[in-house]
Curated annotation (Swiss-Prot):
One of its GO terms (biological process) is cytoplasmic translation. One of the primary rRNA binding proteins. Required for association of the 30S and 50S subunits to form the 70S ribosome, for tRNA binding and peptide bond formation. It has been suggested to have peptidyltransferase activity; this is somewhat controversial. Makes several contacts with the 16S rRNA in the 70S ribosome. The lineage of its organism: Bacteria, Bacillati, Actinomycetota, Actinomycetes, Mycobacteriales. Residues 45-58, 270-280 have a biased composition (Basic residues). Residues 1-20, 29-58, 225-280 are annotated as: Disordered. This is Large ribosomal subunit protein uL2.
Length: 280
């Protein structure tokens, strides 16, 4: 994916860049695979904010993605189109199965219009094919990996991400995650060969606040500039530093959010490397 830089005709354009969408072959989605998508503004069913800084944004329709592919084993499918999906960073591929059904999948790097893909234990090891981990050779780069057999892909679904199959030990496969964490996964889980496409998406510069508003992101306001009624760090005479350890607007101490002693931690072989550049 190529990135186009704008000429500095305005302050907002000066720092902006945009995808060239060179891989996209069709601009209109498959109507039968669209669903309505209502906005929540970051609120739950009680109206309470559960995700801050969300709201507004362009209207979207959800594209139904097939993250399982286990009910199409042995049925060949042809890639009809590569399409843009506003709901994720990766592009999506429209498959026309030879039995007449149409489905979307995450578009891996190198998958082009007209390519024939397959799923099942006997599928070839080529980009876009979906197989159980026990049938994939060690060292293969994969994406769209399941955590539980038949539950659908959960790992390595965003643009440019991938997982490496390091080995197999009994009923488990050893995987290296995008975070460098090494963990065990049930060998019956399925994965797709290759890495997710659209890897240059991370290099796009949005350039101005307005483009983030189009995406549904609202401004992030620091607690120390709020009033005491709005945030524990608010108030004070003049400019202050907050006067306490960093907390959320609801008083929750800032820091690690990963749940300790989670049942799936038993499957971790080696923790991810710490980010040395991150503030302590």
């Amino acid at each position: 994916m190529a990135i186009r830089k704008y000429k500095p005709t305005t302050p907002g354009r000066r720092a902006s860049s945009v995808s060239m969408f060179s891989e996209i072959t069709r601009s209109t989605p498959e109507k039968s695979l669209l669903r309505p998508l209502s906005k929540t503004g970051g609120r739950n069913s009680h109206g309470h904010i559960t995700t801050r800084h969300r709201g507004g944004g362009h209207k979207r329709r959800y594209r139904v993605i097939d993250f399982r592919r286990n009910d199409k084993d042995g049925v060949l499918a042809k890639v009809a189109h590569i399409e843009y999906d506003p709901n994720r960073t990766a592009n999506i591929a429209l498959l026309h199965y030879f039995d007449g059904e149409k489905r979307y999948i995450i578009a891996p790097k190198g998958l082009t219009q007209g390519t024939v893909v397959e799923s099942g234990a006997n599928a070839d090891i080529k980009v876009g094919n979906n197989l159980p981990l026990r049938n994939i050779p060690t060292g293969t780069t994969i994406h769209n990996v399941e955590l539980k057999p038949g539950a659908g892909a959960k790992l390595a679904r965003s643009a440019g991400s991938s997982v490496q199959l390091l080995g197999k030990e009994g009923p488990y496969a050893i995987l290296r995650m995008p975070s460098t964490e090494i963990r065990r996964v049930d060998i019956r889980c399925r994965a797709t060969v290759g890495e997710v496409g659209n890897a240059d998406q991370i290099n796009i510069r949005w350039g101005k606040a307005g483009r983030m508003r189009w995406k549904g992101w609202r401004p992030t306001v620091r607690g120390v500039v709020m009033n005491p009624v709005d945030h524990p760090h608010g108030g004070g005479e003049g400019k202050t530093s907050g006067g306490r350890h960093p907390v959320s607007p609801w008083g929750q101490k800032e820091g690690r959010t990963r749940r300790p002693k989670r049942y799936s931690d038993d499957m971790i072989v080696r923790r991810r490397r710490a980010n040395k550049n991150k503030k302590r």
